[in-house]
């Protein structure tokens, strides 16, 4: 922890550091710290820190600042469900949240990285590009995530979803760096991943004896919130930025007056990330026991009260993804997520199952990780997609499909993963919308891939069930160790939503240790309720 801050173009830029952290910044680990003596009487004036002095310039800008790539190839509707390969629900839940992170997904769909990637082996950005492209262009299907996504992390048992999330983001961050060239640590803070998820804390200590002020700046990638005494995310944020009194045994050793004196320490956000990851600290560090309590979180969150500069307008974030853990310990249970598609509809992503849900249901969960995006960023990327989804003549996809497919295959060797067979790559390159997809189903009812079934007796009269294709995506060639994990459909028992699904794909066993005996259909059912 502790990369220097950057001063570019008259504006401070603080980005993520090389070592991930979720805790409150500690001044002892920060490199940027400036103190100043009062210009007049110690009792009558306060001197601010000038952070512009002695900062190293950026030798190389690894990604354009301020403006992230936009892509018009992103479908507005929800994409594919993900196959559980045995205790991989934590991976699936994390990947779904990243897939629906607009700045990241649009960058992946633009294929900017893979067109210039020179790594001899697969990198995480190329692997994520293939996954996101495949997932977003496979509505109504269940796909199997590449094993490369969890390479070096998955050990065949339940893992913590937050740890895997940060593992993936950190791997993407490293993939942004040129592997064969030396890059200074200032330039590392200019990567695209930093620009999406990175921000910076300011820890300001004020000596109550000489009134000197010391500012320490500490980059962050996610924000951990203590919820022991908080009933809402706003209360947890207020506690986080509440001034801390340093006196008695915790008195401050002032570097200005050279005395051990009482002081106050105030933590604020100096710069806020485009995408904000809030982690609710539900698990103990030692035993892993879970704090199961309801913590309220809003659909729209104003972060301005927690910023260093208070003279600007509201800084509004909108919720777009929620990670949920069901269980009593981080060592067992089940992970699933809720995501907001480009169309504005919320969906529950539970491994292979993708179900329409309401915002009321989303806000009533015992959330573990919350994903917010700046409202301006959401609107900017949404407008780009809306402009790119112009009507196309039927069959237009067929005329340019070969060109797009060849372009995708030439991008990078990682995009030619075994599970990305010709049929799936062909699907991944099509630009589709939910309305267009429904229209195609009406025109091709004789095709076995999709069936729009009649309303079942157990569903509301205005519900629509879209059944899973008979094609088993990603399951054509099973690994030997996976063969023993296939379940017998006749022994499958499910409750609630699972009882309404009538697909034909078998799922893999062992989403978690605790739920190892509970089987799950590997079809992908889309339930639309008004």
Curated annotation (Swiss-Prot):
It is found in: Nucleus; Endoplasmic reticulum. GO terms for cellular component: cytosol; endoplasmic reticulum; nucleus. It catalyses: Thiol-dependent hydrolysis of ester, thioester, amide, peptide and isopeptide bonds formed by the C-terminal Gly of ubiquitin (a 76-residue protein attached to proteins as an intracellular targeting signal). The active site is at residues 89, 334. Residues 80-375 form the USP domain. One of its GO terms (biological process) is regulation of apoptotic process. Residues 511-524 have a biased composition (Basic residues). It is an enzyme of class 3 (hydrolase). One of its GO terms (molecular function) is cysteine-type deubiquitinase activity. Keywords: Apoptosis, Endoplasmic reticulum, Hydrolase, Nucleus, Protease, Thiol protease, Ubl conjugation pathway. PROSITE patterns: USP_2, USP_3. Residues 498-510 have a biased composition (Polar residues). Its EC number is 3.4.19.12. Residues 382-412, 491-524 are annotated as: Disordered. Belongs to the peptidase C19 family. USP17 subfamily. Deubiquitinating enzyme that removes conjugated ubiquitin from specific proteins to regulate different cellular processes that may include cell proliferation, progression through the cell cycle, apoptosis, cell migration, and the cellular response to viral infection. This is Ubiquitin carboxyl-terminal hydrolase 17-like protein 3. It comes from Homo sapiens (Human).
């Amino acid at each position: 922890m502790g990369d220097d801050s950057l001063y570019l173009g008259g504006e401070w830029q603080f980005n993520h550091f090389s070592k991930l952290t979720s805790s409150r910044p500690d001044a002892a680990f920060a490199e940027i710290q400036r103190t100043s003596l009062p210009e007049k009487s110690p009792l009558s004036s306060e001197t601010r820190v000038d952070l512009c002095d002695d900062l190293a310039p950026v030798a190389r800008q690894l990604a354009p600042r301020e403006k992230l790539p936009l892509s018009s190839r992103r479908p507005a509707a929800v994409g594919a469900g993900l196959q559980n390969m045995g205790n991989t629900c934590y991976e699936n839940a994390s990947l779904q949240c990243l897939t629906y992170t607009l700045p990241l997904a649009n960058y992946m769909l633009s294929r900017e990285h893979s067109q210039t990637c020179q790594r001899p082996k697969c990198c995480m950005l190329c692997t994520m590009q293939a996954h996101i492209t495949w997932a977003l262009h496979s509505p109504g299907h269940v796909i199997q995530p590449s094993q490369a996504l969890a390479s070096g992390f998955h050990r065949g048992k339940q893992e913590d979803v937050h740890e895997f999330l940060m593992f993936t983001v950190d791997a993407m961050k490293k993939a942004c760096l040129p592997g064969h060239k030396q890059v200074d640590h200032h330039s590392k803070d200019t990567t695209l991943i930093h620009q999406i998820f990175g921000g910076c804390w300011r820890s300001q200590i004020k000596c109550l004896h000489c009134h000197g002020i010391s500012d320490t700046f500490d980059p962050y990638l996610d924000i951990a919130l203590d919820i022991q005494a908080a009933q809402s995310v706003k209360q947890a944020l207020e506690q986080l930025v509440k001034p801390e009194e340093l006196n008695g045994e915790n008195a401050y050793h002032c570097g200005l007056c050279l005395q051990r004196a009482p002081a106050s320490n105030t933590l604020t956000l100096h710069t806020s990330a485009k995408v904000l990851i809030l982690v609710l600290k539900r698990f103990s560090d030692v035993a892993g026991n879970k704090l199961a309590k309801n913590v309220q979180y809003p659909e729209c969150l104003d972060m301005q009260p927690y910023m260093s500069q208070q003279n600007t307008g509201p800084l509004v974030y909108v919720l777009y993804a929620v990670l949920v853990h069901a269980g009593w310990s981080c060592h067992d249970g089940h992970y699933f997520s809720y995501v907001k598609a480009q169309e504005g509809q919320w969906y529950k992503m539970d491994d292979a199952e993708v179900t329409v849900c309401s915002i009321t249901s989303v806000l009533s969960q015992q959330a573990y990780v919350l994903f917010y995006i700046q409202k301006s960023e959401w609107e900017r990327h949404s407008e780009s997609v809306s402009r790119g989804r112009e009507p196309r003549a039927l069959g237009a996809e067929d005329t340019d499909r070969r060109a797009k497919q060849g372009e995708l295959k030439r991008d990078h060797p990682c995009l030619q993963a075994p599970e990305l067979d010709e049929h799936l790559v062909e699907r991944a390159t099509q630009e589709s919308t939910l309305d267009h997809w429904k229209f195609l189903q009406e025109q091709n009812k004789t095709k076995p891939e999709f069936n729009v079934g009649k309303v079942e007796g157990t569903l509301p009269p205005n519900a629509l069930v879209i059944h899973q294709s008979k094609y088993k995506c990603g399951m054509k060639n099973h690994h030997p160790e996976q063969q023993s994990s296939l379940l017998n459909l006749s022994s499958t028992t499910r409750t609630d939503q699972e009882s309404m699904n009538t697909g034909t794909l078998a799922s893999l066993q062992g989403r978690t240790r605790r739920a190892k005996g509970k089987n799950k259909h590997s079809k992908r059912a889309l339930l639309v309720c008004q």
